Amino acid sequence: MDGFSEYDPEKGIPLAIDPNLISIPVSTSLTTNGNGDEGVNNEDATVFAADDADNAKSQKSLIQNPYEYFGQMPLEQFIPLMLQQRGTGTKFADIHEETLLEEISRENSSKSNNAIQEEDNDDSAIQNVDEKTTTVVNEGVSDSHEMKDEDGDVNMDVPSVESSPKLAEEREPTADANDAQRAISGNQEESITLEEFKMIKKNVLEHVNMALNESSLSLEFVSLLLSSTRTSAGISSMSPYLKKIAPPASLNADKVPLDILDEHEKLTYDIIHKGWNLRSLEDCKRLLKQHYQILSKSVESEYHYWKQISDNITNKDVLFKMKDKNTGRRTLGIKYGFDDSGSCYSADKGIALLRATSEGSQLELVPIIDSGINVGISRGSSEQFVRVRIFTKIEQEDDYLLSGQSSLNELLLSSRSDIKSQIAKLRFFIFEKELMHQLKKEAGQLLPYGVSVENENKVLLELSNEKIEFELINLDEEVTSNYQQEAAKVNDKRANLILVMLNMLLVVMYKKQLWKRLNPNPHSSKSSKGYGKDLVLLRAILGKIRHKKYTQLIEKIVNNAILEKKEDSIMTTNTDITSNDNEPSKNKELATLQREIALFDKILSMPRTDFTINIPEKGKLELSLRSTNHCNAIIHMKYIDVGQVVKFDTRFSEFTEFEEFLNFVYNEFLI
């Protein structure tokens, strides 16, 4: 298409926009009356205008635009319409691009064949019309010769070829045939390929969209400008988006007169302009410098922060992300508790924040005591440790004298404030708190054996001639100074050993709990029976002390009842009686835990001592001092004569009964 095609009433006007956007007046008759009467012409024009006004909707459209009907149609409407036109049984999934291309090619070929056939028909019709026209003209000429008057002049009353109705009817098909021939030739000249049509369509759509966008922007600008003077008119044409972001009457236009400046004023304005630019540059320079300093300080602080973490945190420490409730920032948390090692202590979660100090030069640990409460590493109630003191009874008096006290841990006397020291202190404090918690829990089961809980931080163990006190005290300057000033006592070493033993037994308790967690079938192993019993802390120490007292008492009874009376008799003692029936686990980790727990079997096992009394010519007497709960005493007694015959085998739980029966045996069998 060259853009200069003439107007064709059959084809319409070649436009590239939607015809609904414009209003085209209906074309009037292009022919005039042959008589040239102006009154008749005016009357005909009036009649045509009235008919056009009444039948505007029934007139044939000047423009053929199928895009008007299908271009703006949504897919949910277009797809059913297309399937309906293609016939029943057609599925949209069966329509492919290749199928559509084949249909388009077949349609184009059929159209070209039809056009050729119509052209042949038009040629034959034109030839027939020419022959008819020639015949009619010849007849008219012959008639004109025949209609001459007597003088030989032609009669003017005879109608001419142009004014003859017959000739006019014959000429109209000739004009229609010529128009059809021109239309066919025009269609052949204006035919384009599918690719060219798509390209033209794409360009037209781009230009239309651009024109619509520009017109919309222009309308928005004019509406906003109009709203300052005519609010209702401006708001009615404004889009909802513009109403939301730009209030009405926010744009105005004024006519400002342009004053012509002289050279001096131009120079002044130029200097002011450069001054403002210079001031803006100075402000930018100052802001950039400030932000650079802030960023440099932040980078330096971050560098020191991560360097200290790298220097003080090892691969054994557990780090994780958490939120600092004081600052609201995401930071690192460290787990200093012993939950992963087998601890069941839940009063303190053992979690602390790694927070940089205000100066940013050092890190500090902020432990989280419970949910929502953050407590710093300042000396306070959270710093507590267990102290062991031994009180010895004064002879012939009811008063007790302090004879021993556990020493203060060197970690508490250190003044170092680095992260390693802080982590070590936090672990020490939480370990001491859990130790006191377990001591109080176990003391409730040992009340019949002289163990009592005086308050929430003190457990007292009473023996025959001494008292052992376990107390959780706060770490303050007074306690520290008292430890440094007090002189050494007799039982200080014993108090330290008791405290160390309690710490080691608590570690063994951790290992037992960890063994239970790692063992998939804890009831299938023989060692699970021993690991599943009550936890042993005070019970083990108290049992050893009481067992030693019981052993001394039995030796005294045997010495008075037999050894002093039978000088040749000999008593031997065996205390190293431990049995290890635990089968080694095939799991490497479980086997390691079993070996570590087995190191404490001697103190964790029930105390037992065997006595063998050999009496010449009378046989032997076997005694076994045992316990069922670490604290009580059960005596097994068996007498075997010279002939290896067991005379009796009995058991006692009271020492008075044992002493009486031993005297009876001596009088009946050993004299």
From Swiss-Prot:
Disulfide bonds: none
Record keywords: Activator, Nucleus, Transcription, Transcription regulation
Cellular compartments per GO CC: core mediator complex; mediator complex
Gene3D superfamilies reported in the protein's UniProt record: 6.10.250.2620
Ranges for region Disordered: 104-188
Record localization: Nucleus
A GO biological process held by the record: regulation of transcription by RNA polymerase II
Oligomer status and interactors: Component of the Mediator complex.
Primary role: Component of the Mediator complex, a coactivator involved in the regulated transcription of nearly all RNA polymerase II-dependent genes. Mediator functions as a bridge to convey information from gene-specific regulatory proteins to the basal RNA polymerase II transcription machinery. Mediator is recruited to promoters by direct interactions with regulatory proteins and serves as a scaffold for the assembly of a functional preinitiation complex with RNA polymerase II and the general transcription factors.
Listed name of the protein: Mediator of RNA polymerase II transcription subunit 17
Protein encoded by which gene: SRB4
